[in-house]
Design a protein with these regions (language model features):
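Conserved G1/Walker A P-loop phosphate-binding module
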Residues: 1-57, 207
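C-terminal effector modules of nucleic-acid-centric enzymes and ribosome-associated factors
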Residues: 8, 108, 119-123, 133, ...
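Residue-level signature of catalytic and energy-coupling elements of molecular machines
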Residues: 13, 19, 38, 59, ...
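Conserved Switch II/interswitch segment of TRAFAC-class P-loop GTPases
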Residues: 61-64, 75-96, 106-125
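Conserved nucleotide-binding/hydrolysis micro-motifs of P-loop NTPases
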Residues: 63-64, 87-90, 106, 115-119, ...
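Conserved catalytic-core segments of large NTP-driven translation/proteostasis enzymes
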Residues: 116, 133-277
């Protein structure tokens, strides 16, 4: 089925809602207030379907006080019905809506001159020619113009047939599904149902989606597209999703939905902006179905000779937003339209102003190779490609292909990280520092990567492989050149036992002890196994090892408590031993092995 999403646009009372009703019989003004006032206040959604063609309509309000509602409805549309009354011609909101369509990237326009039954030929001609002249000021593609009256069925039928035959190429980023909730319903017997416009790739019945604003992953229990159950929903379709999650109550109107793990939220967006704005201006950012308070920082103004007034700006937001590269937005100031633009860098970058402007120019021109080079040189300890769909509008596989063209770069394909070659040298210096301060250090690529969160295991192994003149290797471990490996193991055992004993009844966790000796976790685990096999260390829990003599001390103290109080439980033992609940429970359970002790409910007592 071919599916197209159309938004209406135009001045208040120019006949947008009446035109859609004439096309498909749907009454968009459904509330009492809308009917009483004769204007559209909220968004309404309907469709026209025939012979495999589906035209979805978003009827938006034309009143100047409802700009945010108009923007939230129009943002996902592929084309627009620009509705202009033949008797009034272009009015204030007509012009404003035209600008918004331009800012939102809605290039396909069907011009609808309405109320032709009550206008003269001169009025109709003037309204049409003036509208076309205004549209020519922008980069619009006017598909066709219609002279209409809702009382002239032939004119409505001509528009209807044109729309049903219309085909528009999908230009949306298809990397991932993106979905902003514009309405929520609780339906008896079904639960929570969200509606919104699906952009990008498809979603499937039974699949999983993630609400990034609420932090809730949910299942798709059922889906409908224009009141019909579907197993797959595609780009530019109006989709109702029946949400399956015990945390569904956290989901709110305006939330952003996609696949989990592909987006990060930030309070800053770097953008190209078209319009008029001053540095430090307080604005409302309209993006998707959201409206967020923001402050604009102007990075640079327009270049000489540019047709439109444009700026690179940074928007500092009141709350996090999960925006995407090239996502369209509109800015309002005091309720008035300031302009609009595109997000170029949705990920907050700690760049100086000059470097940031360079990056934005590269992103504006989609020169991703140059952008990757700048980011590689800026982030000496690597930058990731996992969120490349959000960051650059391309899949990680495509980002990897670009990264492989970089010079003086190391690419970790498994971890999707890009490093400058200097990162490897930094790792070598780090390893040299470890073995210089601790001659007993035993390392692996894994242990080095654990100590430096920015370094991947692959990068660590590359650095180690180039240090063969400085390191020896045995049993999967690297250590200082010339050191006796068997003595290193003995020294490690002695050191671990010493640290466990030093902790008395509250010993450190094994991994914390391993860090003291700069040893690989496997080497530390092997040393602990040897100590427990010898009986000098006892394992009480997954992460709790105590020396045998200190365990005897713990049991002795608990027996003293029982002698004093007649019993030992978590409450009195915790206070008596001055330990955390974790340690106290472990020692009480160890005491259960003493044949003199019996457990009655949660209390340990001496057998009678």
């Amino acid at each position: 089925m071919s599916s197209i999403l159309l938004a209406s646009a135009g001045h208040i009372d120019h006949g947008k809602t009446a035109l859609i009703k004439a096309l498909n019989g749907f009454e968009g003004d459904s509330t009492d207030e809308e009917k009483r006032r004769g204007i559209t206040i909220d968004l309404s959604f309907s469709h026209l379907e025939k012979n495999g063609a589906n035209i979805a309509f978003i009827d938006v309000p034309g009143h100047e006080n409802l700009l945010k509602t108009m923007i939230s409805g129009a943002f996902g549309a592929e084309a627009a019905l620009l509705v202009v009354s033949s008797t009034e011609g272009l009015k204030a909101q007509s012009l404003e809506h035209i600008k918004i369509l331009e800012f939102l990237g809605i290039k396909k326009i069907i011009l609808c001159i309405t109320k032709c039954d009550i206008a003269s030929k001169e009025q109709i001609s003037h309204s049409k020619s003036a509208s076309l002249a205004e549209l020519r000021k922008y980069d619009f593609d006017v598909l066709k113009s219609f002279e209409l009256s809702i009382f002239d069925s032939s004119s409505i039928e001509a528009l209807r047939q044109f729309l049903l035959a219309l085909r528009i190429e999908n230009t949306q980023n298809s990397c991932l599904p993106r979905y902003y909730i514009d309405r929520l319903f609780n339906i008896k017997g079904a639960g929570l149902v969200a509606t919104g416009t699906l952009l990008g790739s498809s979603i499937e019945l039974g699949g999983k989606l993630y609400d990034y604003d609420a932090g809730v992953e949910f299942g798709i229990r059922s889906m409908q597209v224009h009141d019909k159950p579907v197993s797959v929903a595609n780009n530019a379709q109006r989709v109702a999703i029946n949400i399956s999650s015990p945390l569904a109550h956290k989901i709110k109107k305006g939330d952003f939905i996609s696949k989990k793990g592909n987006f990060r939220g930030f309070k800053e967006l770097d953008c190209v902006f078209f319009g008029s704005i001053t540095h430090g201006a307080e604005v409302s950012l309209c993006i998707g179905t959201k409206s967020i308070n923001a402050k604009a920082s102007v990075l640079s103004s327009k270049k000489e000779g540019e047709k439109n007034e444009s700026y690179f700006i940074t928007l500092k937001l009141d709350k996090e937003v999960f925006a995407s590269f090239d996502e369209r937005f509109v800015l309002l100031g005091g309720g008035a339209l300031l302009g609009g633009g595109r997000v170029l860098n949705p990920i907050s970058e700690p760049l100086k102003k000059r470097a940031k402007i360079q990056l934005l120019i590269m992103l504006l021109e989609r020169d991703f190779l140059a952008a990757f080079e700048l980011l590689k040189n800026t982030h000496k300890k690597g930058f990731g490609l996992l969120c490349s769909a959000q960051r650059f509008g391309i899949l990680p596989s495509s980002a990897l292909k670009i990264a492989k063209e970089l010079k003086n770069a190391i690419i970790d394909e498994d971890e999707l990280n890009v490093y400058d070659t200097s990162a490897k040298e930094s790792l070598k210096d780090f390893i040299r520092f470890i073995i210089s301060k601790n001659e007993l250090a035993m390392l692996s690529a894994s242990s080095v990567a654990l100590k430096l969160p920015w370094a991947s295991k692959m990068l660590a192994q590359m650095a180690i492989d180039e240090m063969k003149s400085e390191l020896d290797f045995e049993n999967g471990l690297y250590f200082k050149k010339g050191a006796d490996f068997s003595k290193l193991k003995e020294s490690l055992e002695e050191g671990i036992l010493r640290e466990i004993e030093r902790g008395v009844l509250a010993p450190l966790a094994p991994y914390n002890i391993y860090d003291i000796f700069e040893c690989d976790r496997k080497a530390g685990d092997d040393a602990l196994k040897r100590l427990t096999a010898r009986g000098v260390v006892v394992r009480l829990e997954h992460n709790l090892f105590i020396s045998a003599k200190n365990l005897d001390l713990a049991k002795k103290r608990l027996l003293e408590l029982i002698a004093r109080d007649g019993y030992a439980d978590v409450s009195n033992a915790k206070d008596f031993l001055n330990l955390s609940r974790k340690y106290t429970i472990a020692y009480l359970e160890a005491l259960d092995n003493d044949e003199r002790i019996e457990k009655i409910e949660n209390k340990r007592v001496l057998k009678s």
